[in-house]
């Protein structure tokens, strides 16, 4: 197998790895979007009821009542908390969802482009394999 053919097989492998990484990134983006949407839904719910479920860990919750549901405390860094109005946080989270949706679109476009390269490269490799087979068949001695 010549060096160019080896390089094409390696490129095909790299493209497949890139697609896998991009799909993993898409999955992470989807999880972030879902978490933000759940948070928005919970904050919207505070407008009609002060009762919340407070997570204790390992799937355990306790019912509690929000003392000041108009204010949300956000973690904005290591040991840094910021208090904001609930409506402002909802707007911020909605903007984050929009940005993540744009990022998701870019990642999907990159996956599509990479898949096109994979198809193109596979086609070239199939043509080369067919040509090698044909040459190999022509070189075999004929038996009578």
UniProtKB/Swiss-Prot annotation:
Presence of the UniProt keyword Cytoplasm in the record: yes
Q: Which organism is it from?
A: Methanococcus maripaludis (strain DSM 14266 / JCM 13030 / NBRC 101832 / S2 / LL)
Write out the coiled-coil annotation as residue ranges. none
Keyword list (alphabetical) reads: Chaperone, Cytoplasm
Name the principal localization, coarsely classed: cytoplasm
Subunit structure of this entry?
Answer: Heterohexamer of two alpha and four beta subunits.
**SUPFAM superfamilies hit by this protein:** Prefoldin
This chain's function reads:
Molecular chaperone capable of stabilizing a range of proteins. Seems to fulfill an ATP-independent, HSP70-like function in archaeal de novo protein folding.
Can you provide one Gene Ontology molecular function annotated for this UniProt record?
unfolded protein binding
| Recorded GO CC terms | cytoplasm; prefoldin complex
The UniProt similarity line reads: Belongs to the prefoldin subunit alpha family.
Looking up InterPro entries in the UniProt record yields: PFD_alpha_archaea, Prefoldin, Prefoldin_subunit_alpha
**This protein's record includes keyword Ligase:** no
What is the protein named? Prefoldin subunit alpha
């Amino acid at each position: 197998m010549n060096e160019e053919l080896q390089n094409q097989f390696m490129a095909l492998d790299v493209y497949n790895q890139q697609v896998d990484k991009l799909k993993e990134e898409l999955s992470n983006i989807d999880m972030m979007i879902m978490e933000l949407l759940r948070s928005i839904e919970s904050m919207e719910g505070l407008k009609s009821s002060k009762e919340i479920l407070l997570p204790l860990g390992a799937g355990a919750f306790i019912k509690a009542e929000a003392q000041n549901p108009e204010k949300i405390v956000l973690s904005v860094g290591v040991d840094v908390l910021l208090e904001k109005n609930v409506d402002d946080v909802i707007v911020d989270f909605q903007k984050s969802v929009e940005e993540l949706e744009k990022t998701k679109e870019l990642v999907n476009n990159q996956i599509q482009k990479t898949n096109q390269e994979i198809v193109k490269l596979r086609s070239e490799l199939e043509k080369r394999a067919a040509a090698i087979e044909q040459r190999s068949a022509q070189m075999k001695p004929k038996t009578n």
